[in-house]
Amino acid sequence: MLNQFPGQYSNNIFCFPPIESETKSGKKASWIICVQVVQHNTIIPITDEMFSTDVKDAVAEIFTKFFVEEGAVRISKMTRVTEGKNLGKKNATTVVHQAFKDALSKYNRHARQKRGAHTNRGMIPPMLVKYFNIIPKTFFEEETDPIVQRKRNGVRAVACQQGDGCILLYSRTEKEFLGLDNIKKELKQLYLFIDVRVYLDGELYLHRKPLQWIAGQANAKTDSSELHFYVFDCFWSDQLQMPSNKRQQLLTNIFKQKEDLTFIHQVENFSVKNVDEALRLKAQFIKEGYEGAIVRNANGPYEPGYNNYHSAHLAKLKPLLDAEFILVDYTQGKKGKDLGAILWVCELPNKKRFVVTPKHLTYADRYALFQKLTPALFKKHLYGKELTVEYAELSPKTGIPLQARAVGFREPINVLEII
């Protein structure tokens, strides 16, 4: 069965062929997806028999490797496959067979995306934030202080000028915004005075309008021409290593070239010496009706979000909301170290359910809870209890809390004593 899949098998690991692309700086980038089988914490050989018969206590692991020419290799977290699909049917799969099917599906999807990348008209995915409500100490160890900016709850957008002089405005996922003529008109005027190679990175926004309304306007072919473009960064495809503080200086110079813009704005920068100053600014911004704050490492390069990469040179500060929800079930994580670790399932008044990660339990405690907590014990001690949940925001589409973490039960309950 191994010979039915494209790729090479070596050292007990099967790797699909590399999918190669070229970065905007001209370097070759490679993405590889691999499958291995683990039994009792040991990688074991993959045999053809595993495609028809499961091996006791064995799980399959899928992972990817990504590297740019002359750069370090980044290895993803393991996705574990613990059971096949369609069990009991003619088309049933074993653990290993299912893992290979899943990996092949991801391989084909990535290959299609990369084929399309050659016709993406110069789109570079914007830099994404890694840290949430944490500012690394290294931000304050640079010669230049980090800067803080207002965080607007809008729609991410990047602007660039194409070879024919037309303005391209696209999303975080490299989807072109077809409307927004009021913004594109001003961008075209601005590009008459600046380096046409520069990309402007920002957010589509209208103050105090809900995100759902903003997204609807941004994605409409014909919009109401009310949205504004707030630019918080800029970059050049061949100068991605340029530090953040230098990019901000150039961005200020860009906006000095044309100061009569109505719908395009440079985001205001605030230099901070320590975490307390950043937190005070965050509190100020929230009072003003904004979502929070963004902190930028002064010496950080511009790191595009290829393959959903999140840059360690950005931090997002937002208030955590909290509310109480009814606990109705429990489950486990699906990938990596979360597999086998307990998760709570809560229910909204409209009966929609969502998963909550216990905040104050160690992984060891979560593993033990999932292993020892029976449905009978859960029903007797936990079902229907009110669970205090902190979260970043509610999904505008479903109303489900996002980034939800369980703080504790309303009534004092030590869940570890139950087991």
Curated annotation (Swiss-Prot):
Catalytic activity field: ATP + (deoxyribonucleotide)n-3'-hydroxyl + 5'-phospho-(deoxyribonucleotide)m = (deoxyribonucleotide)n+m + AMP + diphosphate
Cofactor(s) needed by this chain: a divalent metal cation
GO molecular function: ATP binding; DNA ligase (ATP) activity; metal ion binding
Region NTD: start-end pairs: 1-120
E.C. no: 6.5.1.1
Residues binding a divalent metal cation 1, per UniProt: E203
Residues at the active site: K151 (n6-amp-lysine intermediate)
GO biological process, alphabetically ordered: cell division; DNA recombination; DNA repair; DNA replication
Alphabetized Pfam families for the sequence: DNA_ligase_A_M
Keyword terms, alphabetized: ATP-binding, Cell cycle, Cell division, DNA damage, DNA recombination, DNA repair, DNA replication, Ligase, Metal-binding, Nucleotide-binding, Virion
Subcellular location: Virion
Binding sites annotated in the UniProt record for a divalent metal cation 2: E291
Location of region: AD domain: 121-317
Further comment: Consistent with its intracellular location, ASFV encodes its own replicative DNA polymerase and three base excision repair enzymes: a class II AP endonuclease, the repair polymerase Pol X, and an ATP-dependent DNA ligase.
Note on domains (UniProt): The N-terminus domain (NTD) plays a critical role in DNA-binding, catalytic complex assembly and catalysis.
Descriptive protein name: DNA ligase
Gene coding for it: LIG
